[in-house]
Amino acid sequence: MKKIWLALAGLVLAFSASAAQYEDGKQYTTLEKPVAGAPQVLEFFSFFCPHCYQFEEVLHISDNVKKKLPEGVKMTKYHVNFMGGDLGKELTQAWAVAMALGVEDKVTVPLFEGVQKTQTIRSASDIRDVFINAGIKGEEYDAAWNSFVVKSLVAQQEKAAADVQLRGVPAMFVNGKYQLNPQGMDTSNMDVFVQQYADTVKYLSEKK
């Protein structure tokens, strides 16, 4: 009986220690106004944002978060309009096209690099070329660009950003209740930071 009690006590302590790793106001913050019906895990980004580029291409935050998510929990990525002027809005629509066609993974890197690294993306035509070079037919892209589905996805992205009163990117939200706070995480080591970020998302996705 004593051994069983000690084992149970150990489990309780382990659980308490695990929960204590995550503190509201440290690794995450609770939204004042929860957003009903928000995607389970929602990341906002811009192809114009240098930190978003780092998150995607250097730290691989999205990939690491996806690996940690419980079964059945989906991650969604939305592009924002408030960077890049008119071209930023074109990229939000292009991201809606990517979502509609299911080609996000094919165009993410070339769009980031075309905007920030090579600076070869300067117009809607340049964006279209990225999709064609990624294997999407021009007529398929054009049909999607002008479709009701894409227009709806653009509106959906804009509404989601307004609902959480988004101030900057990159930003990640969980269940419309919590926002990740990278500044409250361990940044002394890149791998540790990425691990803590992904673990925090997992914790919040399971939080009742």
Curated annotation (Swiss-Prot):
Keyword tags: Disulfide bond, Periplasm, Redox-active center, Signal
SUPFAM superfamilies reported in the protein's UniProt record: Thioredoxin-like
Species annotation:
Escherichia coli O6:H1 (strain CFT073 / ATCC 700928 / UPEC)
Which cysteines are disulphide-bonded? 49-52
User: GO molecular function, one example?
Assistant: disulfide oxidoreductase activity
Entries under InterPro entries matching the protein: DSBA-like_thioredoxin_dom, DsbA/DsbL, Thiol_disulfide_DsbA, Thioredoxin-like_sf, Thioredoxin_CS, Thioredoxin_domain
Q: Which GO terms describe its cellular component?
A: periplasmic space
Task: Specify the Thioredoxin domain's residue ranges.
Answer: 20-150
Q: Where is the signal peptide?
A: 1-19
Protein location? Periplasm
Where is this protein chiefly located? periplasm
Function noted in UniProt: Required for disulfide bond formation in some periplasmic proteins such as PhoA or OmpA. Acts by transferring its disulfide bond to other proteins and is reduced in the process. DsbA is reoxidized by DsbB. It is required for pilus biogenesis.
Name the protein family: Belongs to the thioredoxin family. DsbA subfamily.
Q: What is this protein called?
A: Thiol:disulfide interchange protein DsbA
